[in-house]
Amino acid sequence: MTVTEITPLDKRRSKVILDEDFALALYNGEIKRYHIETGEELPEETYREIMEEILLKRAVERVCYLLKSSDKTEQELRKKLKDGYYPGEAIDYAIEFLKKHRYINDEEYGRRYVEYHSTKKSKRQIQYELQRKGLSKE
């Protein structure tokens, strides 16, 4: 994989774009530690190491942090991670971790949402909101 571009996201993190279409966010110290530079080749073993030692764990920590304040659907969590430049492999790993430990359950979320909002919103509004959150009509 070739590092196409490194763009700062904030003071501490940068977006690393690989092969012009695949992006991931790393802290500047991690970029230095793995000697990642624009135009250079990123060896597969280095990528695997970054994925396994950093990104998979960070994705799980991020979704747990997001769930701390309020329940979310699988789709909402996937979108948040994607917006945070987590690769698909890390997103899938984090979602599977949550499902395995029963931190997320879209069916249960939908049931609680309907129960809570049934007196305040119409049936159609509730259906629309649940579809927007990634849940089916049922």
Located regions from the model:
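An alpha-helical, amphipathic repeat domain used for nucleic-acid recognition
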Residues: M1-E138
